[in-house]
Amino acid sequence: MRAELNKGLIDFLKASPTPFHATATLVQHFEAAGFQRLDERDTWAVETGGRYFVTRNDSSIVAFRMGRQSPLSGGIRMVGAHTDSPCLRVKPQPELQRQGFWQLGVEVYGGALLAPWFDRDLSLAGRVTFRRDGKVESQLIDFKLPIAVIPNLAIHLNRTANEGWAINAQNELPPILAQVAGDERADFRALLTDQLAREHGLNADVVLDYELSFYDTQGAAVVGLNGDFLAGARLDNLLSCFAGMQALLNTESDETALLVCTDHEEVGSSSACGADGAMLEQIVQRLLPSSEDYVRTIQKSLLISADNAHGIHPNYADKHDANHGPKLNAGPVIKVNSNQRYATNSETAGFFRHLCMAEEVPVQSFVVRSDMGCGSTIGPITASHLGIRTVDIGLPTFAMHSIRELAGSHDLAHLVKVLSAFYASHELP
């Protein structure tokens, strides 16, 4: 099971270079399992035992299985994750021609570790909006091939490079695509028009706009002398999206189960398709006949917010609290913060620990050092919007927000097992 899950995650990561592609890949899996797409613009008629999914902005998805009994009876078991990761996004007018090279201006999306982006074989993917035969359409594209690179400056020209230096995102991050002649004019939209034709056979009249990100073409892999680790891009947080999907597909229960994977977590979630928007609340409201039933159901429900945790690094162990250093391959981590950067409380933490013990899944705890700031997740945001009890958990990871992150190769199976047990559970606290 462990090897099969890791292989599935590696394939999922390869197919999901952007939130748009991640959502499309999730849709493919759910449709293959018999889930029915719902359109938010239509009237819904969900049925007992039915399986459905909804997307918004092509970058967020809510998938759910209606239980054999009403959600009002036993509540809804929810798992939440996010589809986006820190990256470099192409600017609206990106063409740069400097010293005979064609480059693209980029904007840093989220809290990216920038240094690892240098000297990588980069490709480009995302969503393009265009006009064809008088109609406005959108399509996902993925160049797949390594079409760009951000070369480092040689140490001979930067003698203090190994002493640390501030990276200027405006000047130092534009990737190089090609060499151009002095009188040659680079045309990025023409490149996108060609890609639409090459990848989809579409003859666009004009490219109107786009949301495109660079990504590392090196695929994810199981690594280490004994295969202990899983290395790859976007583990934060496609690992949790994949685990939640597997758990939802693997379980049948009398209770209603739901997976929500939203966009824009890395930049605050404040969007129509982010956790700070109304998407999840609006969808759950439509599953219940009245506002009274909605409130009662939410108070019987529970959310597991799944987002990667900081594993204790052997070279930087002093960055962790001495008693709270999560280890790779030692199971999921319950994340706690007294200032509500995580939504965990003693009741929800206790329930998650109970699930892990019942499934013989190891479990750990994380709290940030008292002299350091703490990150956050969709957990507190969703708990605030819905009023739902929430526990923040995640798998321990090294190099979070790097272009290539590292997790334990045993931990995905741990997470899928406990999330499956959660979806199948008959009683919530």
From Swiss-Prot:
GO terms for cellular component: cytoplasm. Zn(2+) binds at residues 82, 156, 401. This is Probable M18 family aminopeptidase 2. Its cofactor is Zn(2+). It comes from Pseudomonas syringae pv. syringae (strain B728a). Belongs to the peptidase M18 family. GO terms for molecular function: aminopeptidase activity; metallopeptidase activity; zinc ion binding. InterPro entries: M18_aminopeptidase_2 (IPR022984), Peptidase_M18 (IPR001948), Peptidase_M18_dom2 (IPR023358).
